[in-house]
């Protein structure tokens, strides 16, 4: 009986690990500052955040790549906000992504900053 329970746990472990991922939409605030415009605006949007199933092999072959999965945008739209106080001739708009859905997938370094999120600066800087 003990052997059967152990075998069942080992069989279900990968399935349960994948089921416990928590990649999904998260509400975030973004602060945008333009020195020439002399102002700072903060607005809310949605991004993708959470955990994805990943594993790291003990033996690594130089013939095989080992991509890790991250919580990435699946569907996205872009919205634009108006930057107040800008002099004429300046770009008065800031365009940003809004996540509609998320998925666990390999991070595309061509279009995404795949590094850790910088949480040290939470708003606009004062000079």
Curated annotation (Swiss-Prot):
GO cellular component terms? cytoplasm; extracellular space
- Give GO MF terms, alphabetically: hormone activity
Which positions are tagged coiled coil?
A: none
Ribonucleoprotein as UniProt keyword: no
Q: List the disulfide bonds.
A: 23-71, 37-86, 40-124, 48-102, 52-104, 107-114
* Entry keyword set: Disulfide bond, Glycoprotein, Hormone, Secreted, Signal
Domain of life of the native organism: Eukaryota
Signal peptide positions are 1-22
Q: Which GO terms describe its biological process?
A: G protein-coupled receptor signaling pathway; ovulation
The positions flagged as glycosylation sites are 27, 44
| Location of the protein in the cell | Secreted
Query: What Pfam families does its record include?
Result: Cys_knot
Q: What does this protein do?
A: Involved in gametogenesis and steroidogenesis.
Whom does it interact with, and what assembly results? Heterodimer of an alpha and a beta chain.
Q: Which family does it belong to?
A: Belongs to the glycoprotein hormones subunit beta family.
Query: Could you identify this protein by its name?
Result: Gonadotropin subunit beta-1
Organism classification:
Eukaryota, Metazoa, Chordata, Craniata, Vertebrata
Q: Give the encoding gene's name.
A: cgba
